[in-house]
């Protein structure tokens, strides 16, 4: 009897691992569907502002990072970047060449820099918020407190949003300053000032919205009993 029980244990462990893996894939697919629906619904995921687009697509990526961890968050961040790539290729604005190599304005065209701008910041949106929240929880536990950290949720949301905005805009300056200046009818010498104005006009409100939404949604979904009921495993250690 003892041998039989011992033989069953690895099989049970394997079945449990497979079940967790399937649940993880389903959860990732659900968040992926949310991102795709938002991305391709007019004025929802991407909001046209003439020369550029504002976005709140980073919010589900941030929430996914907190609930499922940085690996799945990074995958969903890549999906965020892919929707941006498709949107800017199929429905371009004057500056879409910074997000896709398949669009040009006059003599200005995209290239490898476009792919870096389109994907790298968005992947990081799915990774960094997890560690920001984990750090907030570490300091919270040091003070003898438990439960969801409101400050951590806000910081995670703001960080994810600012990582996207600051990296995208600064990489535009690195790779496409002349083309970006020409597309916006701005002198090359003044293009970074123009970029800073976009960060202020678009980036700051986006960060505030991301912080508020991450707090409101996270306060519900990050509670231990809710996470366990929904099957989320994020390795935050609480």
Set out the residue ranges of the language-model regions.
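Loop-helix junctions at membrane interfaces
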Residues: 1-238
């Amino acid at each position: 009897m003892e041998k039989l029980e011992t033989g069953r244990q690895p099989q049970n462990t394997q079945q449990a691992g497979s079940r967790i893996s399937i649940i993880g894939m389903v959860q990732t697919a659900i968040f992926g569907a949310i991102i795709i629906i938002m991305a391709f619904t007019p004025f929802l995921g991407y909001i046209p502002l003439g020369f550029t687009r504002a976005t709140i697509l980073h919010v589900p990526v941030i929430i996914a990072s907190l609930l499922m961890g940085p690996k799945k968050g990074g995958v969903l961040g890549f999906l965020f970047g892919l929707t941006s790539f498709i949107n800017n290729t199929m429905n371009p604005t004057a500056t879409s060449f910074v997000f896709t190599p398949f669009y040009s304005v006059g003599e200005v065209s995209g290239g490898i820099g476009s792919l870096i701008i389109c994907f790298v910041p968005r992947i990081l949106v799915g990774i960094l918020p997890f560690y920001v929240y984990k750090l907030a929880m570490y300091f919270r536990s040091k003070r003898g407190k438990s439960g969801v950290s409101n400050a951590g949720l806000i910081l995670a949301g703001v960080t994810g949003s600012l990582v996207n905005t600051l990296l995208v805009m600064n990489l535009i300056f690195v790779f496409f300053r002349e083309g970006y200046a020409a597309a916006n009818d701005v002198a090359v010498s003044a293009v970074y000032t123009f970029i800073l104005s976009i960060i202020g006009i678009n980036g700051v409100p986006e960060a505030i919205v991301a912080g508020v939404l991450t707090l409101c949604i996270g306060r519900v979904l990050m509670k231990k009993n809710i996470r366990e009921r929904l099957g989320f495993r994020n390795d935050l250690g609480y």
